[in-house]
Amino acid sequence: MGFFDFLKKASAPATPAEPTFPLTLAADAKGTVVAMENIPDEVFAQGILGKCCGIEPTEGKVFAPVDGEITQAPDSGHALGIMGVGGVEVLIHVGVDTVEMKGDGFSPKVKEGDKVKKGDLLLEMDLDKIAAAGHPAVVITVVTNTDDFKGVEVVASGDVEPGADLIKVSK
């Protein structure tokens, strides 16, 4: 052990603490919460991909609902996958059938492999273009590995701001 080794140990980065459960996913858009069964797409409304809810956006920005890493970022820009802290797998899907827009109206701010923090801007969308294309713009947040958890519960209703509590995940 060298004389200055204690300095190296002191400056080593701290290991991030494991998240405590229940873990709360934040609202990823400004707007009005849409219950899962009212999402205008049967795959989401029936919970086939996992428990979810939507937000009918009033602004064209989508933010990270959880700390994690971007695992999916298709070129179309209409969806993102995040491996969140605590093993929570999140799919953010912007709009219904918006994949048909082939990226027009979507401006992703992240790419696959990027680390994100809750509240980081993930993408911008042109709500007018989405409406003109005839698609609902609802921002859908899905916990795709719902079955890995004891509970996944939507805790918000009415109007929400980005960062407000949206979904509670219990282990």
Language model regions located:
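Contiguous, well-folded functional domains in the mature portion of proteins
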Residues: 2-171
